[in-house]
Amino acid sequence: MTEALARSATASREAEELATRPKIVGASVKRTEDPRLLTGRGAYVDDRKVPGVLHVAFRRSDHSHALIKSIDCSAARKADGVVAVFTAEDMAEVNAVFATSRMKNYYATPITGLATEKVRYVGEPVVGVIAQSRYLAEDALELLDIAYEPLAVVIDPEEAAKPSSALLHEEAGTNVLCSREFKTGDAEAAIASAAVRVSERFRFHRKTPTAMENRTYLAEYEPGRDELTLYTSSQVPGIIRDALSDALDMPGSQLRVIAPDVGGGFGGKASLYPEEIFVAFAARRLGRAVKWTSDRMEDLAATSQGFDQIVDAELALDAEGNAVALKAEVIGDVGAYSIYPWTAVIEPVQVVSFLPGPYKIANYLGRVRGVATSKPPTGPYRGVGRPTSTFVTERLMDMAAQRLGKDPVALRLRNMIQPGEFPHRIGSGIIWDQCAFTECLNAACEKVDYQNLRARQAEARAAGRWFGIGVACYAELTGIGSRISVAPGMPINTGTETAKITVVSTGAVTAAFGVTAMGQGLETTLAQVVAEHLGGRVKDIRVIQGDSAAVPNATGSYASRSAVLAGGAATLAAKEVKEKMIRAASHLLETGPEDLVVEDGKVSVVGTDRALTFRQLARAVYLEMGRIPADKREELASTKTYDPVFGTSATAAHIAVVEIDPDTYEIKLERFVVAEDCGRL
């Protein structure tokens, strides 16, 4: 009973403090990372200077699909400045990495540092040359003699899915690396009896993430302790550490992966790459630091790509415009390999998962196949499935509105999940927790004066002007928790994040996370969260991120999760450290915990001028023995893992007003309005 009352009092005090003190989270503050980044003092992988570092250049496949008959490295090994030349045979002791999944009808392809036995796409690394400079390594590439036996090229995913197609991975017995079906109700029967049906085939072409900083890896090896540190321009250093531990048979305690400043990622740096495996292997084999920085052509050819899908979709409605069924067949071109850790499933399955969007559709049938082709692997890239699914569903809504003679906004509002209907499970099983679908669309319409805008459009059309109004709404699952992340059965848990917050003996606060900053301002955001819940000052909090050794478990930054999950972990850890500080201060100031408040970097007795700064309190805890009894002394630190379990939903409505000159085809964007549910600001 006493403990319960104490917890209640603590919760009430925290709520009162948050309500009365100046807001930190959501306040406009100067970004703490900006001074060094804007003055050119950022520290990226390529900026790291290591005496005697060796440089790698890769000879890449110039065939889309071919057997490797022979590789003659003799001339290259004799070239000036060349230290080593490695092929797949030299890496026999390195284990292949597999992006496993418990999902039915899924095949995991091996990921290796260099192509083994055959190549499956143009740009796949075949030989690694290591020399005293990148120039010398590049020169030696021309001395390699590789004999190939060309095989049938597999380009079209629909053809590749046929049993008669040439196989990229013979052991799989098929090019269909994954297939899945989502079904609610009887979509086919509902479509057959519907008053109105609209359908279309949509073709989405490949995109390549093109970050300002190319992919770069630097491996440093300490032979005496068999310790390897990989500096990588990765979004996911914790994931890379764990994968390399398996590949190299090295305990995690001897492997450290650090992502310093990263110049953008967009999903393209969120996966394990063959070059990372190779650089780590080479550094350990040679006992030297080894570095590879991709040039722009390599980055475009060998970084994972996205959005390569064919979608056949049909929407059925009754005569009043109520959507009754949605059906879709999706073929995802996943490239030559199932990428680690996300698997070939990541993009095509999410297209099908999110197709119902913000609409109530009782009957849904979505089928998807991920098909291997002779192209670079696909992986996460900006939105992962949502741009495709949103485009398809919104286009079908426009087609249906035209067929029914209804206003596109009115049709959407009729079919949207309404404010009192949350949480809502859509046909694929995704749950929208609390969304503002109708509120966002109404707000956007109000902002553009939608009814008058339609009147203007009618006048313009009557005058022969091409005046268009585009409307689109979306829903996105962000900050996903463990319940969602385990569904695909991947080899990692992407649904949690860990924070470690420590107040050291000087009173300084360090907050360590497993996420990685790529320009999104996480250093400032997380410092704000810690400051608010700890009672410190933003300027006094040092944020450590992108280091696999900083926290026990980490995955990284991707999928609109970093602020949500790392911020949640920061909140839990900061609150626990604050409780410890209050207990210590209560003893030192000889007052009850309920009379103490923590803010602005000090613990104060309410209504008095009695206070302890963080520095004074930390010295009493750590250095001034006897001030706090040994049995009551607590380390001012906490490590907490946050799991939102399901996740949260982000929603928005977009309205574009565009006019095209019918003579010159000049495009004029008159207005673009977005109404978004941004949560707490």
Across the structure, where does each feature detected by a protein language model lie?
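Flexible, low-hydrophobicity surface segments
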Residues: 1-173, 177, 197, 285, ...
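Phosphate/diphosphate-binding loops
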Residues: 125, 132-133, 287-335, 451, ...
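Accessory "access/gating" subregions that flank catalytic or transport cores
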Residues: 191-198, 203-208, 413-502
